[in-house]
């Protein structure tokens, strides 16, 4: 025994073994460390080498005293061989470590006495089995043996079979991307413990972690023995739509969604799965201590409340708990940015692409093309193209070829008979408006400025020319079809597509005849309530015209077949949308009927309490209904046939509203749990879904049906 103490005093050994003498006192931590604060150089080198390999800064360790380094910064502080040890004494017994990283030869050894401060219970995680070999019983008072290989790997992407062999091990809380456990056969929830205590000396090393969010790793790994289980009330509040997918709970820890074949065991480093919210973990990043989350997302720290979601909760939202439970449901528009803030009105000339000043002669044009068409169409001069009638007409070359410019005007639907349709944002009657403004209030004048000029048009009305001219073009979703289909990827692409289409819906609505004469609040409300129905109706038409209603043609780069319908977890909604698309073929809807029905769909959902100028809205809606009836009568001379056709089209319009409501419910539930299923919501989509959609779901906003439901 005397010989062992002499060996312990010898420096330069490489084994790094430290053993606690039997006579050491454990009553006082400070007195104990004060008497045994000498650390060998080899032990320091071992600690530094392991810290560097893990990406931890060594500079922060050098400023601490030897006792503080041993207490707070030794990476082997908890006992690695078993579950956390709970002892009445303030410190755990010494861990017995054998280091092979610095191997100067067998027989040499250095023994030092030290004491380690344990972390909070439930945070002990073991290093990867192939990186560190650990042995020891999990009982109190036992010592574990830690063996280091010649090369310490930073992280390892293992398979599920390899992870299953070590699934009973308590993992040590380090930023290593460890292979997670196999997905459970049944849904479960894992309790997230309190975050690490950053008041200790460990904070200095944690601040320099290469991933920058070491404080956020409290949710990684498997649940500790003391995690417990969620209550029945907590379990019942989970929506069944977002719980399981093919026997797997949202994918592996850190996976961020489903993965294709061959990727089941691949796990990326944790630092690359967090959203870019900052370089270091903040206090607000941690959830409440008793918040429960699905087991598959324990490696994802819940998002802090985003700025686009309100912070005031309505009484009917009390059943939604979690980070999004305090969502504010807007009752007034004081805190909502106007939709013009996101979508400034932009109109381009259909002839040359310059900024359009309004609808001239039945088409959106600039002032230059308006004057050119008037002179060219009324004049008797014949224009001939010097080339092949395919000249480029743009803002800078529109004067080069009058023949091609005039031809493009006719192709855009410009006619001399459309002069009565004035600027789109301001449908003013010159003489009638001036005379009525002096004798009646402004509101009465505005009500007379509806699309009354539309009445009396012939079988090819100018109204249809306007609808064809302002119809939005093709919008792509930006979906990467080379990646395997997953729930998160498909729904994120749909949300991005919805954001892009919403921009076109706003521009299209503002170009509709009579729309700008609505009260500005009514304009915003009508768009925000009807956008879902408009997109569903337009998507059904695209599916009918492009793929014969066999699939859902959301965008050229996002077409849903049967597999994607199931993968998106909205199969029932997709089936109803496909049936709507098939109705276009069964009823033989013409493009003119579709355009007028789509415009009428914009004016088919309003608040129960009414709009600011409800009377004018009703008059405008009635004019669009008359236009639909006039389009029907153009090709049918039999009144009975016209009535039957009007009945069919209005029934089709009514069928859009239940589909839109189902999608409203789906998107709202998805927004509530978006941070758990890795689905991205653009800012404007999140704003409308969180503020306006609840009004529809709660019954404060209802659609207008043609027929009794």
From Swiss-Prot:
Residues 1-34 are annotated as: Disordered. Residues 414-708 are annotated as: Interaction with KAT7. Coiled coil: none annotated. Pfam families: Androgen_recep (PF02166), Hormone_recep (PF00104), zf-C4 (PF00105). There is a cross-link at residues 635, 637 (Glycyl lysine isopeptide (Lys-Gly) (interchain with G-Cter in ubiquitin)). There is a cross-link at residues 191, 310 (Glycyl lysine isopeptide (Lys-Gly) (interchain with G-Cter in SUMO)). The record marks 687 as: Interaction with coactivator FXXLF and FXXFY motifs. Residues 341-708 are annotated as: Interaction with LPXN. Residues 361-451 are annotated as: Interaction with HIPK3. Belongs to the nuclear hormone receptor family. NR3 subfamily. Steroid hormone receptors are ligand-activated transcription factors that regulate eukaryotic gene expression and affect cellular proliferation and differentiation in target tissues. Transcription factor activity is modulated by bound coactivator and corepressor proteins like ZBTB7A that recruits NCOR1 and NCOR2 to the androgen response elements/ARE on target genes, negatively regulating androgen receptor signaling and androgen-induced cell proliferation. Transcription activation is also down-regulated by NR0B2. Activated, but not phosphorylated, by HIPK3 and ZIPK/DAPK3. This is Androgen receptor. It comes from Oryctolagus cuniculus. The gene is AR.
């Amino acid at each position: 025994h005397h010989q062992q103490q002499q060996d312990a005093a010898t420096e330069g050994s490489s084994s790094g073994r430290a053993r606690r003498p039997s006579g050491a006192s454990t009553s006082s931590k400070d007195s104990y460390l004060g008497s045994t604060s000498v650390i060998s150089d080899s032990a320091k080198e071992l600690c530094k080498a392991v810290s560097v390999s893990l990406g931890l800064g060594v500079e922060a360790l050098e400023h601490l005293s030897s006792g503080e380094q041993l207490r707070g910064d030794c990476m082997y502080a908890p006992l690695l061989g078993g579950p956390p040890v709970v002892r009445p004494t303030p410190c755990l017994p010494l861990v017995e470590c054998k280091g092979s990283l610095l191997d100067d030869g067998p027989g040499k050894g250095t023994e030092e006495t030290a004491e380690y401060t344990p972390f909070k219970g439930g945070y002990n995680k073991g290093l990867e089995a192939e990186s560190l070999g650990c042995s020891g019983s999990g009982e109190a008072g036992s010592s574990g043996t830690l063996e280091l290989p010649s090369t310490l790997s930073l992280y390892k992407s293992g398979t599920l079979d390899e992870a299953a062999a070590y699934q009973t091990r308590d993992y040590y809380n380090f930023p290593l991307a460890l292979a997670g456990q196999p997905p459970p056969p049944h849904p479960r929830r894992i309790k997230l413990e309190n975050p690490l205590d950053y008041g200790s000396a460990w904070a200095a090393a944690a601040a320099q972690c290469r991933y920058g969010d070491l404080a956020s790793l409290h949710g990684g790994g498997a649940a500790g023995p003391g995690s417990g289980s969620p209550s029945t009330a907590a379990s019942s509040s989970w929506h069944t739509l977002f719980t399981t997918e093919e026997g797997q709970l949202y994918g592996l820890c850190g996976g961020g969604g489903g993965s294709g074949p061959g990727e089941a065991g691949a796990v990326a480093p944790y630092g690359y799965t967090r959203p870019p919210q900052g370089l270091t973990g903040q206090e607000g990043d941690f959830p409440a201590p008793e918040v429960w989350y699905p087991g598959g997302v324990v490696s994802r720290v819940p998002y802090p409340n985003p700025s686009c979601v309100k912070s005031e909760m309505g009484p009917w939202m009390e059943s939604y708990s979690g980070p999004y439970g305090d969502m504010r449901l807007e009752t007034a528009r004081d805190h909502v940015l106007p939709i013009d803030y996101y979508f400034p009105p932009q109109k381009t000339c259909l002839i040359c692409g310059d900024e359009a000043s309004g609808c001239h002669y039945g088409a959106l044009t600039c002032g230059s093309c308006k004057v050119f068409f008037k002179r060219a169409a009324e004049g008797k001069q014949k224009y001939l193209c010097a080339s092949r009638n395919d000249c480029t007409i743009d803002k800078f070359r529109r004067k080069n070829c009058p023949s091609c410019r005039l031809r493009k005007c006719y192709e855009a639907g410009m006619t001399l008979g459309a002069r009565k349709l004035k600027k789109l944002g301001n449908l003013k009657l010159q003489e009638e408006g001036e005379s009525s403004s002096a004798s009646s209030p402004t509101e009465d004048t505005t009500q007379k400025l509806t699309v009354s000029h539309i009445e009396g048009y012939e079988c090819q009305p100018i109204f249809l020319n306007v609808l064809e001219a302002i119809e939005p073009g093709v919008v792509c979703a930006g979906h990467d079809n080379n990646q395997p289909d997953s729930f998160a990827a498909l729904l994120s692409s749909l949300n991005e597509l919805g954001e892009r289409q919403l921009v076109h819906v706003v521009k299209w609505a503002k170009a509709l005849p009579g729309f700008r004469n609505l009260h500005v609040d009514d304009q915003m409300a009508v768009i925000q309530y009807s956008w879902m129905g408009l997109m569903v109706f337009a998507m059904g038409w695209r599916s009918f015209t492009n793929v014969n209603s066999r699939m859902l043609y959301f965008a050229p780069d996002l077409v849903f077949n049967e597999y994607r319908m199931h993968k998106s977890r909205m199969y029932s909604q997709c089936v109803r949308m496909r049936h709507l698309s098939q109705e276009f073929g069964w009823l033989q809807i013409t493009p003119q009927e579709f355009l007028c029905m789509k415009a009428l769909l914009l004016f088919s959902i309003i608040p129960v309490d009414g709009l600011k100028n409800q009377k004018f809205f009703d008059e405008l809606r009635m004019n669009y209904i008359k236009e639909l009836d006039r389009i029907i009568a153009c090709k049918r001379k039999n009144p009975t046939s016209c009535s039957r056709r009007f009945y069919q089209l209005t029934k089709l319009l009514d069928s859009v509203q239940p589909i839109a409501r189902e999608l409203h419910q789906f998107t709202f539930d998805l927004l509530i749990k978006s941070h758990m299923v890795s689905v991205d919501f653009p800012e404007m989509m999140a704003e409308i879904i969180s503020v306006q959609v609840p009004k529809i779901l709660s019954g404060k906003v209802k659609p207008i049906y043609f027929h009794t439901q």
